[in-house]
């Protein structure tokens, strides 16, 4: 019998065995024997737990039926069986902060081996301790204020305007795809000095797209599956990185290297001893942080603004004011860092988009020891899922939380919606190193979008919470060019 046929018949049995093992893990009740007081909740089905209900598609601007029902029934902190493990789910902003601010002391990242295999075992998402801090420092240096001001700002504007010049009026196109082009080109230029349209850049883009599909796929390492293709794409990316590193080292020795530390690869070769696999894992992490999340946020802001013309008018007024002031001073039209810092309402729009869009809805952690919080015990070894979206959509924190209201951020410091309740990309040791880059990309995109276009939805499309927010149709839009003075 052919191996493929054997696998076909064995797969249902293997799946049942895997689910059974996961179910047994999820059924851990040793806490009862130890007299611990865990939060109320339900462990769901004996085998599957409540994972399917937890991951059921829902609008990314809501918590979803599962979370809403459980919070109403059990409170903001409850227990469940998710992803094959007993889990504490937190919709409580205080517990969320407590977990994130005690990373590595009381809690640690909790990813299955299948996820680590695809992300890379030296990925910042997986690493802990000194190596995590070292990789994080490289990322912060790469996406720090100095490079944002001197490199990313100008490159962002260049790639955004180049993309906009290709837009045709009244012809539908997917906004998500256009946002991805801009953010990907920006990152690979600053990481590897690859320019848009170059064969290596296009090859890397296709490999990365295959890689990302596997990150959110069922982890079946079988021929033809998205997960298997992602593993293969990662291996090809690492070979590509190794080749680029060797070429750069040869050029440096020959005195023909004209790039130096202008990109991340040059900086790594000069300032660290990372090997090709470590740099590849860093690259994939930075592409996710500086490309994937930024492209999603840009698409969300286009979506939200379409239903809020008052905000679009306010943005145009702000950006026209900056353009006219630059003209009056005789300055060139290219944006400066000072121009960017003046875009205060644009920052409010970004903050509101990240709050309502919930790009990172939750994270996975595991208790390293027994932890007590608000009268409850979190047993050692249990998973903990802080749900950031819960605070972002809490009516006791944000008035009318389902409404897109950028103006709320003009007075946010005086209300109940303190910055402590705002965690679009986490907090603490493992917060996103690319948050400021993402904000800048969105603001520069808004500057040129609102000054040059009106837009409308070509067909209905709404963001759903997959592993990350996404639009089933890619958010098809049509644009009309403006001639603002």
From Swiss-Prot:
Primary localisation category: membrane
Entry EC no(s): 1.14.14.-
Keywords annotated in UniProt: Cholesterol metabolism, Heme, Iron, Lipid biosynthesis, Lipid metabolism, Membrane, Metal-binding, Monooxygenase, Oxidoreductase, Steroid biosynthesis, Steroid metabolism, Sterol metabolism, Transmembrane, Transmembrane helix
PROSITE patterns xref list: CYTOCHROME_P450
Gene3D superfamilies: Cytochrome P450
Pathway assigned in UniProt: Steroid metabolism; cholesterol metabolism
List of residues binding heme: 432
Reactions mediated catalytically: cholesterol + 2 reduced [NADPH--hemoprotein reductase] + 2 O2 = (16S,22S)-dihydroxycholesterol + 2 oxidized [NADPH--hemoprotein reductase] + 2 H2O + 2 H(+)
Membrane topology according to the record: Single-pass membrane protein
Membrane-crossing segments per the record: 4-24
One Pfam family cited in the UniProt record for this chain: p450
Reported uses of this protein in biotechnology and industry: The coexpression of CYP90G4 and CYP94D108 in the yeast strain RH6829, which was engineered to accumulate cholesterol, leads to the production of diosgenin, the main precursor for the industrial production of steroid hormones.
Keyword Hydrolase in record: no
Family of this protein: Belongs to the cytochrome P450 family.
Function: Involved in the biosynthesis of spiroketal steroid and saponin natural products from cholesterol such as diosgenin and analogs (e.g. furostanol and spirostanol), plant defense compounds used as main precursors for the industrial production of steroid hormones. During the 5,6-spiroketalization of cholesterol, catalyzes the hydroxylation of cholesterol to form 16S,22S-dihydroxycholesterol and, possibly, the subsequent conversion of 16S,22S-dihydroxycholesterol into 16-oxo-22-hydroxy-cholesterol and 16-hydroxy-22-oxo-cholesterol.
Protein name per the record: Cholesterol 16,22-dihydroxylase CYP90G4
Gene: CYP90G4
């Amino acid at each position: 019998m052919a191996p493929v046929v054997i696998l076909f018949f064995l797969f249902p049995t293997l799946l049942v065995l895997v689910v059974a093992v996961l179910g047994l893990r999820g059924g851990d009740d040793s806490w009862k024997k130890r007299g611990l007081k865990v939060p109320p909740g339900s462990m769901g089905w004996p085998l599957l737990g409540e994972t399917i209900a937890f991951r059921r598609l829902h609008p990314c601007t809501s918590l979803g039926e599962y979370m809403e029902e459980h919070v109403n029934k059990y409170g903001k902190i409850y227990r469940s069986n998710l992803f094959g493990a007993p889990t504490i789910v937190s919709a409580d902003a205080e517990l969320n902060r407590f977990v994130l601010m005690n990373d590595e002391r009381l809690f640690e990242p909790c990813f299955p081996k299948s996820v680590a295999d695809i992300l890379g075992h030296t990925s910042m998402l997986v690493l802990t301790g000194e190596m995590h801090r070292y990789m994080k420092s490289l990322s912060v240096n790469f996406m720090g204020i100095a490079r944002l001001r001197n490199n990313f700002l100008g490159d962002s504007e260049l790639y955004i305007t180049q993309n906009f010049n290709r837009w045709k009026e009244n012809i539908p196109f997917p906004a998500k795809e256009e946002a991805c082009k801009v953010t990907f080109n920006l990152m690979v230029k600053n990481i590897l000095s690859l320019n848009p349209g170059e064969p290596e850049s296009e090859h890397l883009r296709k490999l990365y797209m295959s890689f990302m599909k596997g990150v959110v796929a069922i982890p079946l390492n079988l021929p033809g599956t998205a997960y298997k293709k992602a593993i293969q794409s990662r291996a090809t990316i690492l070979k590509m990185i190794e080749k680029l590193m060797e070429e750069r080292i040869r050029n440096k020795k020959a005195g023909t290297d004209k790039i130096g530390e202008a990109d991340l690869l040059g900086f790594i070769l000069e300032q660290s001893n990372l090997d090709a696999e470590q740099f590849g894992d860093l690259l994939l992490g930075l592409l996710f942080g500086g490309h994937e999340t930024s492209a999603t946020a840009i698409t969300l802001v286009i979506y939200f603004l379409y239903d809020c013309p008052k905000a679009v008018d306010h943005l145009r007024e702000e950006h026209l004011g900056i353009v006219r002031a630059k003209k009056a001073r005789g300055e060139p039209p290219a944006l400066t860092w000072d121009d960017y810092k003046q875009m205060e309402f644009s920052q409010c729009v970004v903050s509101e988009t990240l709050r309502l869009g919930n790009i990172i809805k939750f994270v996975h952690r595991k208790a390293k020891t027994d932890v007590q919080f608000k009268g409850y015990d979190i047993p050692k070894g249990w998973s903990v899922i802080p749900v950031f979206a819960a605070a972002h959509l809490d009516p006791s924190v944000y008035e009318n939380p389902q409404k897109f209201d950028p103006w709320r951020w003009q007075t946010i410091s005086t209300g109940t919606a303190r910055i402590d309740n705002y965690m679009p990309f986490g907090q603490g040791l493992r917060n996103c190193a690319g948050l400021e880059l993402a904000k800048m990309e969105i603001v520069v995109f808004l500057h040129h979008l609102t000054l040059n276009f009106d837009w409308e939805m070509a067909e209905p499309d709404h963001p759903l919470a997959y592993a990350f927010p996404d639009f089933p149709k890619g958010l098809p839009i049509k644009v009309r060019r403006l001639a603002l003075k």
